């Protein structure tokens, strides 16, 4: 009987503790000042895909003035669709605007 009472009291206390805990809401902070560029280029990513994407994006946007190419961050994805036997890669790059 003593153990049953102790169990019931601990359950009630646990219930009160769990009710007093506030839910933590995840806050989505929008990344202000971040621009995203996507491009499709010939070839596969390989081991240095990020570097190849940065170079390809710099060549592609060579003529645009004021472009901050120093902070360019890229990801490389191999395109699963091969057209006419030529592999392609997709580069998604982000830059501070």
Swiss-Prot record:
User: Which keywords does this Swiss-Prot/TrEMBL entry list?
Assistant: Antimicrobial, Disulfide bond, Fungicide, Plant defense, Secreted, Signal
The positions making up the signal sequence are: 1-26
- Kindly give the InterPro entries that the UniProt entry links to this protein: SCRL
Gene Ontology CC terms? extracellular region
Establish whether keyword Membrane is in the entry: no
Q: Could you mention a single GO BP entry for this protein?
A: signal transduction
Please verify whether the record's keywords include Signal. yes
Subcellular location(s): the record lists: Secreted
The set of disulfide-linked cysteines is 35-97, 45-76, 53-91, 74-93
A Pfam family hit? SCRL
The UniProt entry's sequence similarity note says: Belongs to the DEFL family.
User: What's the protein name?
Assistant: Putative defensin-like protein 227
Q: Which gene encodes it?
A: SCRL28
